[in-house]
C-alpha cells in the first residue's frame, strides 16, 4: 500500500472537459482504489456539486475549493488551500491510494507544481480548433499526459485530427497524448492505464 496517495492534477481551459474526465475516472476507479477528489471553482462549488449529483464518489470524499479571482488563475498560486484540502482528505480517509485535483482554470503554476501533483493531465478540446496544439504552452508541451477531448466535434468545427496528431507529436517531443470522447468513453482506458503505470498504482 502507498504511504502517501498518488496526486493527479487535471488542468485545462474552461469547458474542455476536465470535470467530465474526473467523473469518468471516479466511476471507473472507485471500486479498485481508495479514491478522493479536490475541485477548484472561482466563487462556487459547482464542479464538486456536479460530481456529487452524478454519484462519482461519496460526498465526503469530494472537497470543493472556492478560489476567488479570475478563471485563468482559479487555483491559488501557492497551492496552500489545495494542500490543506489534500491533508484533510488524508486525515478523513487513511490509506488513500489516489487523489484527483481538478483545477478550475488553465493556470498551471499551482495545479502542476510538484508540491501538489505527482502526475499532471492537461485537457484541451477539438472545438478550440486544430491549431491549438501548435500554439504550445506549458500544459500542451510539459504535462505528463495531454488529453485531446471532444474528438466527435471535429467534423462540426472543421478540425483535422490528423493535423492535431502530427502537431502534438512535434510539440510534445515524445511525451504521451490521447484522443478522447468522454461521451462514448473513447480514450478512457488509455488514460487509466497511464495513471496506473506512471503512478505505480496497484489495485487492492
From Swiss-Prot:
GO biological process terms, semicolon-separated: urea catabolic process
GO MF term list: GTP binding; GTPase activity; nickel cation binding
Keywords: Chaperone, Cytoplasm, GTP-binding, Nickel insertion, Nucleotide-binding
A Pfam family recorded for this sequence: cobW
Binding site for GTP: 12-19
InterPro entries: CobW/HypB/UreG_nucleotide-bd, P-loop_NTPase, UreG
Main location: cytoplasm
Compartments reported by the entry: Cytoplasm
CDD domains to which the protein is assigned, alphabetical: UreG
Record bears the keyword Iron-sulfur: no
SUPFAM superfamilies: P-loop containing nucleoside triphosphate hydrolases
Superkingdom of origin: Bacteria
GO cellular component, one term: cytoplasm
Assembly and interaction partners: Homodimer. UreD, UreF and UreG form a complex that acts as a GTP-hydrolysis-dependent molecular chaperone, activating the urease apoprotein by helping to assemble the nickel containing metallocenter of UreC. The UreE protein probably delivers the nickel.
Family that this chain belongs to: Belongs to the SIMIBI class G3E GTPase family. UreG subfamily.
Function of the molecule: Facilitates the functional incorporation of the urease nickel metallocenter. This process requires GTP hydrolysis, probably effectuated by UreG.
Full protein name: Urease accessory protein UreG
Organism taxonomic ancestry: Bacteria, Pseudomonadati, Pseudomonadota, Gammaproteobacteria, Pseudomonadales
Amino acid at each position: 500500500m502507498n504511504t502517501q496517495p498518488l496526486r493527479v492534477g487535471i488542468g485545462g481551459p474552461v469547458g474542455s472537459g476536465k470535470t467530465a474526465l474526473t467523473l469518468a475516472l471516479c466511476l471507473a476507479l472507485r471500486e479498485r482504489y481508495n479514491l478522493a477528489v479536490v475541485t477548484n471553482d472561482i466563487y462556487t462549488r459547482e464542479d464538486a456539486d456536479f460530481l456529487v449529483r452524478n454519484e462519482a464518489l461519496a460526498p465526503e470524499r469530494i472537497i470543493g475549493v472556492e478560489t476567488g479571482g479570475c478563471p485563468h488563475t482559479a487555483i491559488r498560486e501557492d497551492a496552500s488551500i489545495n494542500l490543506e484540502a489534500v491533508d484533510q482528505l488524508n486525515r478523513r480517509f487513511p490509506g488513500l491510494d489516489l487523489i484527483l485535483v481538478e483545477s478550475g482554470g488553465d493556470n498551471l503554476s499551482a495545479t502542476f507544481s510538484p508540491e501538489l501533483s505527482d502526475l499532471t493531465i492537461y485537457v484541451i478540446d477539438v472545438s478550440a480548433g486544430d491549431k491549438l496544439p501548435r500554439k504550445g504552452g506549458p500544459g500542451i508541451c510539459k504535462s505528463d499526459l495531454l488529453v485531446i477531448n471532444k474528438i466527435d466535434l471535429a467534423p462540426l468545427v472543421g478540425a483535422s485530427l490528423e493535423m492535431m496528431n502530427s502537431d502534438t507529436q512535434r510539440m510534445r517531443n515524445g511525451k504521451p497524448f490521447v484522443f478522447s470522447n468522454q461521451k462514448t468513453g473513447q480514450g478512457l482506458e488509455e488514460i487509466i492505464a497511464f495513471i496506473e503505470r506512471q503512478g505505480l498504482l496497484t489495485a487492492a
